[in-house]
Protein backbone atom coordinates (compact mmCIF):
# COMPACT_ATOMS: atom_id res chain seq x y z
CA UNK A 1 0.00 0.00 0.00
CA UNK A 2 2.80 2.43 0.92
CA UNK A 3 4.61 1.71 -2.36
CA UNK A 4 1.38 2.23 -4.34
CA UNK A 5 0.81 5.62 -2.68
CA UNK A 6 4.44 6.58 -3.18
CA UNK A 7 4.24 5.73 -6.88
CA UNK A 8 1.18 7.95 -7.28
CA UNK A 9 3.24 10.77 -5.72
CA UNK A 10 6.14 10.11 -8.14
CA UNK A 11 3.77 10.84 -11.04
CA UNK A 12 2.65 14.10 -9.42
CA UNK A 13 6.28 15.20 -9.01
CA UNK A 14 7.24 14.11 -12.56
CA UNK A 15 10.07 11.82 -11.51
CA UNK A 16 10.68 8.22 -12.59
CA UNK A 17 12.11 7.19 -9.21
CA UNK A 18 12.73 8.45 -5.69
CA UNK A 19 15.98 8.01 -3.78
CA UNK A 20 15.13 7.78 -0.08
CA UNK A 21 17.98 8.80 2.23
CA UNK A 22 16.14 10.35 5.20
CA UNK A 23 16.30 7.66 7.94
CA UNK A 24 12.73 8.32 9.15
CA UNK A 25 11.36 8.06 5.61
CA UNK A 26 13.46 4.97 5.00
CA UNK A 27 12.04 3.32 8.11
CA UNK A 28 8.48 4.32 7.19
CA UNK A 29 8.71 2.95 3.66
CA UNK A 30 10.67 -0.24 4.38
CA UNK A 31 10.33 -1.09 8.08
CA UNK A 32 14.14 -1.30 8.32
CA UNK A 33 15.41 -0.23 11.75
CA UNK A 34 19.16 -0.29 11.05
CA UNK A 35 21.25 2.84 10.62
CA UNK A 36 22.69 2.47 7.10
CA UNK A 37 21.02 2.05 3.75
CA UNK A 38 19.07 3.82 1.02
CA UNK A 39 15.98 2.89 -0.97
CA UNK A 40 15.43 3.54 -4.66
CA UNK A 41 11.82 3.19 -5.79
CA UNK A 42 10.65 3.42 -9.42
CA UNK A 43 7.21 2.81 -10.95
CA UNK A 44 7.98 -0.90 -11.42
CA UNK A 45 10.88 -1.70 -9.09
CA UNK A 46 12.07 -1.11 -5.54
CA UNK A 47 15.55 -1.79 -4.26
CA UNK A 48 17.08 -1.40 -0.80
CA UNK A 49 20.85 -0.99 -0.72
CA UNK A 50 22.82 -1.57 2.46
CA UNK A 51 26.17 -2.97 3.60
CA UNK A 52 27.43 -6.29 4.99
CA UNK A 53 26.50 -5.36 8.59
CA UNK A 54 22.81 -5.08 7.78
CA UNK A 55 22.06 -7.47 4.90
CA UNK A 56 20.59 -10.21 7.08
CA UNK A 57 18.53 -7.72 9.10
CA UNK A 58 17.24 -6.07 5.92
CA UNK A 59 16.19 -9.41 4.45
CA UNK A 60 14.21 -10.18 7.62
CA UNK A 61 12.58 -6.76 8.02
CA UNK A 62 11.85 -5.63 4.47
CA UNK A 63 9.16 -6.89 2.10
CA UNK A 64 8.56 -5.77 -1.46
CA UNK A 65 12.12 -4.56 -2.13
CA UNK A 66 15.11 -6.30 -3.67
CA UNK A 67 17.93 -6.28 -1.10
CA UNK A 68 21.35 -5.42 -2.54
CA UNK A 69 24.58 -5.46 -0.54
CA UNK A 70 26.93 -2.84 -1.96
CA UNK A 71 30.54 -3.89 -2.53
CA UNK A 72 31.64 -0.52 -3.96
CA UNK A 73 30.38 2.71 -2.41
CA UNK A 74 26.66 3.01 -1.81
CA UNK A 75 26.58 5.89 -4.33
CA UNK A 76 28.13 3.74 -7.07
CA UNK A 77 25.60 1.00 -6.32
CA UNK A 78 22.73 3.51 -6.60
CA UNK A 79 24.14 4.58 -9.99
CA UNK A 80 24.29 0.93 -11.09
CA UNK A 81 20.73 0.17 -9.94
CA UNK A 82 19.39 3.32 -11.60
CA UNK A 83 20.94 2.14 -14.89
CA UNK A 84 19.30 -1.28 -14.51
CA UNK A 85 15.95 0.36 -13.79
CA UNK A 86 16.40 2.51 -16.88
CA UNK A 87 15.09 5.65 -15.16
CA UNK A 88 15.67 9.10 -16.65
CA UNK A 89 14.82 11.32 -13.66
CA UNK A 90 15.45 10.54 -9.99
CA UNK A 91 14.01 12.66 -7.21
CA UNK A 92 16.31 13.12 -4.21
CA UNK A 93 15.34 14.37 -0.76
CA UNK A 94 16.78 17.87 -0.90
CA UNK A 95 15.97 18.66 2.74
CA UNK A 96 18.06 15.73 3.84
CA UNK A 97 20.96 15.41 1.41
CA UNK A 98 24.10 17.43 2.22
CA UNK A 99 25.59 19.32 -0.71
CA UNK A 100 28.81 17.27 -0.66
CA UNK A 101 26.84 14.03 -0.95
CA UNK A 102 24.76 15.50 -3.77
CA UNK A 103 27.96 16.33 -5.67
CA UNK A 104 29.07 12.69 -5.42
CA UNK A 105 25.70 11.42 -6.67
CA UNK A 106 25.73 14.01 -9.45
CA UNK A 107 29.12 12.74 -10.59
CA UNK A 108 28.22 9.01 -10.59
CA UNK A 109 24.52 8.83 -11.53
CA UNK A 110 23.74 9.25 -15.23
CA UNK A 111 20.02 9.97 -14.72
CA UNK A 112 18.89 13.54 -14.02
CA UNK A 113 18.71 14.30 -10.29
CA UNK A 114 15.72 16.43 -9.33
CA UNK A 115 15.41 18.01 -5.86
CA UNK A 116 12.08 17.13 -4.21
CA UNK A 117 10.74 17.50 -0.70
CA UNK A 118 7.90 16.26 1.46
CA UNK A 119 6.90 13.25 -0.66
CA UNK A 120 7.17 10.56 2.02
CA UNK A 121 6.56 13.10 4.81
CA UNK A 122 3.11 13.79 3.33
CA UNK A 123 2.24 10.08 3.48
CA UNK A 124 3.52 9.90 7.06
CA UNK A 125 1.09 12.56 8.29
CA UNK A 126 -1.90 10.19 8.13
CA UNK A 127 -1.32 7.27 10.48
CA UNK A 128 -2.17 3.62 9.86
CA UNK A 129 -3.97 1.50 12.46
CA UNK A 130 -0.68 -0.25 13.27
CA UNK A 131 1.02 3.08 13.90
CA UNK A 132 -1.82 4.24 16.16
CA UNK A 133 -1.48 1.16 18.38
CA UNK A 134 2.19 2.05 18.98
CA UNK A 135 1.51 5.78 19.45
CA UNK A 136 -1.17 5.03 22.05
CA UNK A 137 1.23 2.80 23.98
CA UNK A 138 3.96 5.49 23.84
CA UNK A 139 1.41 7.97 25.25
CA UNK A 140 0.37 5.56 28.01
CA UNK A 141 4.00 5.11 29.09
CA UNK A 142 4.41 8.91 29.29
CA UNK A 143 1.25 9.12 31.43
CA UNK A 144 2.56 6.39 33.76
CA UNK A 145 5.91 8.20 34.00
CA UNK A 146 4.15 11.43 34.99
CA UNK A 147 2.25 9.64 37.76
CA UNK A 148 5.53 8.14 38.97
CA UNK A 149 7.53 11.38 38.92
CA UNK A 150 4.92 13.27 40.96
CA UNK A 151 5.82 11.15 43.99
CA UNK A 152 9.55 11.76 43.36
CA UNK A 153 9.71 15.57 43.02
CA UNK A 154 10.47 17.47 46.21
CA UNK A 155 12.41 20.58 47.25
CA UNK A 156 16.19 20.17 47.14
CA UNK A 157 16.53 17.76 44.23
CA UNK A 158 17.87 19.03 40.92
CA UNK A 159 16.12 19.24 37.57
CA UNK A 160 18.63 16.69 36.27
CA UNK A 161 17.64 14.27 39.06
CA UNK A 162 14.04 14.51 37.84
CA UNK A 163 14.99 14.01 34.18
CA UNK A 164 17.13 10.97 35.04
CA UNK A 165 14.35 9.39 37.09
CA UNK A 166 11.83 9.95 34.27
CA UNK A 167 14.13 8.39 31.70
CA UNK A 168 14.96 5.41 33.95
CA UNK A 169 11.28 4.77 34.67
CA UNK A 170 10.35 4.86 30.98
CA UNK A 171 13.20 2.57 29.96
CA UNK A 172 12.00 0.02 32.50
CA UNK A 173 8.64 0.09 30.66
CA UNK A 174 10.37 -1.07 27.48
CA UNK A 175 11.07 2.20 25.67
CA UNK A 176 14.23 2.80 23.64
CA UNK A 177 14.81 6.18 25.29
CA UNK A 178 13.07 9.47 25.96
CA UNK A 179 11.76 11.12 22.78
CA UNK A 180 14.13 14.09 23.17
CA UNK A 181 16.28 15.79 25.83
CA UNK A 182 13.88 16.01 28.76
CA UNK A 183 12.76 19.52 29.68
CA UNK A 184 12.56 20.17 33.42
CA UNK A 185 12.24 23.92 33.97
CA UNK A 186 11.65 25.08 37.54
CA UNK A 187 11.14 28.53 38.99
CA UNK A 188 12.35 31.36 36.76
CA UNK A 189 13.74 28.78 34.30
CA UNK A 190 10.08 28.02 33.52
CA UNK A 191 10.15 31.12 31.32
CA UNK A 192 12.45 29.20 28.93
CA UNK A 193 10.12 27.27 26.59
CA UNK A 194 12.89 24.71 25.98
CA UNK A 195 14.60 24.76 29.36
CA UNK A 196 16.38 21.41 29.20
CA UNK A 197 17.00 19.98 32.70
CA UNK A 198 19.90 21.68 34.52
CA UNK A 199 21.74 21.33 37.82
CA UNK A 200 19.39 23.91 39.38
CA UNK A 201 17.77 22.76 42.62
CA UNK A 202 13.97 22.80 42.81
CA UNK A 203 12.69 25.03 45.62
CA UNK A 204 9.40 25.40 47.46
CA UNK A 205 6.94 27.86 45.88
CA UNK A 206 8.14 27.12 42.35
CA UNK A 207 6.30 25.77 39.35
CA UNK A 208 8.06 22.95 37.50
CA UNK A 209 7.38 22.36 33.80
CA UNK A 210 8.01 18.78 32.67
CA UNK A 211 8.09 18.20 28.90
CA UNK A 212 9.04 14.66 27.92
CA UNK A 213 7.96 11.59 26.01
CA UNK A 214 8.73 7.98 25.22
CA UNK A 215 10.42 6.64 22.09
CA UNK A 216 8.67 3.29 21.77
CA UNK A 217 9.04 0.94 18.77
CA UNK A 218 10.24 3.88 16.69
CA UNK A 219 7.32 6.20 17.54
CA UNK A 220 7.20 8.97 20.10
CA UNK A 221 4.88 10.57 22.61
CA UNK A 222 5.24 14.16 23.81
CA UNK A 223 3.52 15.38 26.97
CA UNK A 224 3.91 18.50 29.10
CA UNK A 225 2.58 19.09 32.59
CA UNK A 226 3.38 21.93 34.98
CA UNK A 227 3.23 21.16 38.70
CA UNK A 228 3.76 23.24 41.84
CA UNK A 229 6.20 22.41 44.62
CA UNK A 230 4.57 24.04 47.63
CA UNK A 231 2.00 26.80 47.25
CA UNK A 232 2.67 29.02 44.18
CA UNK A 233 2.05 32.76 44.02
CA UNK A 234 -1.30 34.16 42.81
CA UNK A 235 0.44 35.36 39.63
CA UNK A 236 1.71 31.86 38.77
CA UNK A 237 -1.62 30.24 39.61
CA UNK A 238 -3.28 32.85 37.38
CA UNK A 239 -1.18 32.02 34.30
CA UNK A 240 -1.73 28.32 35.01
CA UNK A 241 -5.50 28.79 34.86
CA UNK A 242 -5.30 30.81 31.63
CA UNK A 243 -3.04 28.23 29.95
CA UNK A 244 -5.28 25.35 30.99
CA UNK A 245 -8.44 27.11 29.78
CA UNK A 246 -6.76 27.86 26.44
CA UNK A 247 -5.61 24.26 26.04
CA UNK A 248 -9.03 22.83 26.93
CA UNK A 249 -10.72 25.21 24.48
CA UNK A 250 -8.40 24.07 21.68
CA UNK A 251 -9.08 20.40 22.51
CA UNK A 252 -12.82 21.05 22.36
CA UNK A 253 -12.68 22.86 19.00
CA UNK A 254 -10.03 21.13 16.87
CA UNK A 255 -11.54 18.91 14.19
CA UNK A 256 -10.87 17.70 10.64
CA UNK A 257 -11.32 20.14 7.76
CA UNK A 258 -9.65 23.09 9.47
CA UNK A 259 -6.20 24.38 8.61
CA UNK A 260 -3.25 24.49 10.99
CA UNK A 261 -3.80 28.26 11.19
CA UNK A 262 -7.42 27.81 12.32
CA UNK A 263 -6.47 25.10 14.83
CA UNK A 264 -3.72 27.33 16.25
CA UNK A 265 -6.05 30.31 16.70
CA UNK A 266 -8.26 28.91 19.49
CA UNK A 267 -5.62 28.83 22.24
CA UNK A 268 -3.77 31.85 20.81
CA UNK A 269 -6.82 34.13 20.73
CA UNK A 270 -7.87 33.07 24.22
CA UNK A 271 -4.43 33.77 25.69
CA UNK A 272 -4.33 37.10 23.83
CA UNK A 273 -7.75 38.02 25.28
CA UNK A 274 -6.30 37.56 28.78
CA UNK A 275 -3.41 39.92 28.03
CA UNK A 276 -0.65 37.34 27.55
CA UNK A 277 -0.49 37.21 23.74
CA UNK A 278 3.13 38.41 23.65
CA UNK A 279 4.12 35.74 26.18
CA UNK A 280 2.93 32.85 23.97
CA UNK A 281 5.45 32.99 21.14
CA UNK A 282 5.51 29.43 19.78
CA UNK A 283 2.98 27.43 17.79
CA UNK A 284 0.09 25.57 19.43
CA UNK A 285 1.27 22.19 18.23
CA UNK A 286 2.90 19.86 15.73
CA UNK A 287 2.49 16.42 14.25
CA UNK A 288 4.06 13.46 16.02
CA UNK A 289 5.00 10.01 14.74
CA UNK A 290 8.42 8.66 13.89
CA UNK A 291 9.73 12.16 14.61
CA UNK A 292 9.05 14.50 17.51
CA UNK A 293 8.24 17.34 15.11
CA UNK A 294 6.61 16.39 11.82
CA UNK A 295 3.60 17.52 9.83
CA UNK A 296 1.05 18.94 10.23
CA UNK A 297 1.93 22.08 12.18
CA UNK A 298 -0.73 23.86 14.22
CA UNK A 299 0.72 27.32 13.74
CA UNK A 300 -0.11 30.77 12.39
CA UNK A 301 1.71 29.81 9.17
CA UNK A 302 0.35 26.32 8.48
CA UNK A 303 -2.06 25.92 5.55
CA UNK A 304 -2.16 22.12 5.97
CA UNK A 305 -5.72 20.84 6.38
CA UNK A 306 -6.35 18.41 9.24
CA UNK A 307 -7.76 15.01 8.27
CA UNK A 308 -8.71 11.95 10.35
CA UNK A 309 -5.84 9.78 11.65
CA UNK A 310 -3.38 12.65 11.92
CA UNK A 311 -1.73 12.81 15.36
CA UNK A 312 -0.74 16.20 16.78
CA UNK A 313 0.19 17.93 20.02
CA UNK A 314 -1.77 20.78 21.61
CA UNK A 315 0.59 22.75 23.84
CA UNK A 316 -0.06 26.42 24.58
CA UNK A 317 2.15 28.12 27.16
CA UNK A 318 2.73 31.44 28.90
CA UNK A 319 6.28 32.54 29.76
CA UNK A 320 7.12 35.46 32.08
CA UNK A 321 10.86 36.24 32.16
CA UNK A 322 12.16 36.55 35.71
CA UNK A 323 8.98 35.00 37.14
CA UNK A 324 8.31 31.60 35.59
CA UNK A 325 6.14 29.85 33.06
CA UNK A 326 3.47 27.27 32.33
CA UNK A 327 2.91 24.87 29.44
CA UNK A 328 0.32 22.09 29.20
CA UNK A 329 0.48 19.57 26.36
CA UNK A 330 -1.52 16.58 25.21
CA UNK A 331 -1.19 14.32 22.19
CA UNK A 332 -4.41 13.94 20.21
CA UNK A 333 -5.72 11.88 17.31
CA UNK A 334 -7.86 13.68 14.73
CA UNK A 335 -11.07 11.65 14.36
CA UNK A 336 -13.97 11.76 11.88
CA UNK A 337 -15.80 14.47 13.83
CA UNK A 338 -13.29 15.94 16.29
CA UNK A 339 -10.35 14.55 18.21
CA UNK A 340 -9.45 11.98 20.84
CA UNK A 341 -6.86 12.50 23.56
CA UNK A 342 -4.01 9.99 23.66
CA UNK A 343 -2.49 11.38 26.88
CA UNK A 344 -4.75 11.32 29.94
CA UNK A 345 -2.70 12.65 32.88
CA UNK A 346 -4.54 15.02 35.18
CA UNK A 347 -4.31 18.73 34.41
CA UNK A 348 -5.46 20.21 37.71
CA UNK A 349 -2.60 22.10 39.34
CA UNK A 350 -0.92 19.52 41.56
CA UNK A 351 0.76 20.87 44.70
CA UNK A 352 3.55 18.41 45.48
Each model region followed by its residue ranges:
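Active-site neighborhoods and metal-handling regions in enzymes and metal-associated proteins
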Residues: 1-352
Amino acid sequence: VKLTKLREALKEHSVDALLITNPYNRRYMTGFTGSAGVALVSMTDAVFITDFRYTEQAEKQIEGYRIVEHKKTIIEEVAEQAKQMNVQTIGFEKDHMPFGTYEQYHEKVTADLKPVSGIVEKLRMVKTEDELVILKQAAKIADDAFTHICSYIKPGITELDVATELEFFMRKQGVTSSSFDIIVASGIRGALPHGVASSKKIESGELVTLDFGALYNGYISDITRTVAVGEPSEKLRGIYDVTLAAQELALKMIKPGMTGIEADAFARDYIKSKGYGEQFGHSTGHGIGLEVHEGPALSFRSETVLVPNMTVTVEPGIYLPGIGGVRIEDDILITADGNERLTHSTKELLIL
